[in-house]
């Protein structure tokens, strides 16, 4: 089972003050050579995921656009299937479906949605994935789980990409990553979610990545093809002075040293050439071929594109 895949690069964002701004951003992402634009699913200060994805798909020709990620607790999986299949159908097969268990306690509290224990939220998401996959089949779905019940529902419409758009599931814990390794087309290695909500910002070391990838490979051992492996960049800086930049970024991540920062697969610092070499090495060592930028700094889109250009076709 080989991990080797060509590089793909993406950005995740959901901010725009107008239709024109959003359309121009999507077209800019495509023009700069990125493979994907992904849209988060959060309440505060963000565009709504489904219409933003459809707008970006409609504004571009080749760019793949996805959810990063649909929070399972915000919608029923039958609705999620219908929205995902419709997005794929209306884009001629350019949608990518990301789904997660939810982790940001604050937005649960703001909206009155119960923030259940991690085990319950993950179990509910696991059932949701089974419902979504079941609705992709031709026959009516009957499903009786602990969290969802479906009686004779036929999934419609059917997506262009069969049986479903590529499914992304990311996480930082063993249970979620093992499930992703068995069920997803794309597995994302992320900082682990804390039981009280939020993310463990120190959980981005090279040692953490090795441990998580061990869980993924063990769970995916019976699959004929290894899922595509994704890593999210939490920090990025184009600079000629890696050491100075690493010292500054270490102060932003509790418990990390400058060396930890330079070695972390979730952080990219240096010249464009140094970054390209780091990404080649990380693909060789870890298998990471799909890299997504998530910093929120406008200039980073153009700066990271320099790295994307160096690795085009590799």
Q: Which residue stretches match the model-derived regions?
A:
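Active-site-adjacent structural elements that line small-molecule/cofactor binding pockets in enzymes
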Residues: 1-314
């Amino acid at each position: 089972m080989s991990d080797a895949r060509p590089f793909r690069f993406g950005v995740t964002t959901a901010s725009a003050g107008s239709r024109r701004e959003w359309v121009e951003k999507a077209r800019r992402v495509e023009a700069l050579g990125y493979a994907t634009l992904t849209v988060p699913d959060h309440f505060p200060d963000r565009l709504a995921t489904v219409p933003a994805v459809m707008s970006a798909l409609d504004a571009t020709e080749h760019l793949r656009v996805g959810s990063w990620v649909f929070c399972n607790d915000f919608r029923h999986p039958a609705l999620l299937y219908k929205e995902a299949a419709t997005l794929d159908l209306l884009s001629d097969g350019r949608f990518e479906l990301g789904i997660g268990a939810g982790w940001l306690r604050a937005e649960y509290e703001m909206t009155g949605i119960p923030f259940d224990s991690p085990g319950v939220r993950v179990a509910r998401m696991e059932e949701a994935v089974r419902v979504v996959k079941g609705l992709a089949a031709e026959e009516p779905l009957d499903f009786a789980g602990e969290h969802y019940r479906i009686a004779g529902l036929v999934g419609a419409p059917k997506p262009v990409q069969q049986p479903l758009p590529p499914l992304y599931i990311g996480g930082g814990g063993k249970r979620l990553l093992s499930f992703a390794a068995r069920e997803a087309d794309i597995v994302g290695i992320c900082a682990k979610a804390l039981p009280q909500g939020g993310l463990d910002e120190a959980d981005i070391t090279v040692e953490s990545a090795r441990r998580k990838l061990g869980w993924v490979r063990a769970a995916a051992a019976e699959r004929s093809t290894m899922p595509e492996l994704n890593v999210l960049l939490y920090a990025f800086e184009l600079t000629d002075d890696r050491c100075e930049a690493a010292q500054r970024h270490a102060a932003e991540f509790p418990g990390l040293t400058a060396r930890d920062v330079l070695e972390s697969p979730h952080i990219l610092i240096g010249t464009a050439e140094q970054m390209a070499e780091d990404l080649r090495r990380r693909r060789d060592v870890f298998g990471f071929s799909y890299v997504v930028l998530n910093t929120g700094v406008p200039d980073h889109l153009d700066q990271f594109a320099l790295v994307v250009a160096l690795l085009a076709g590799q």
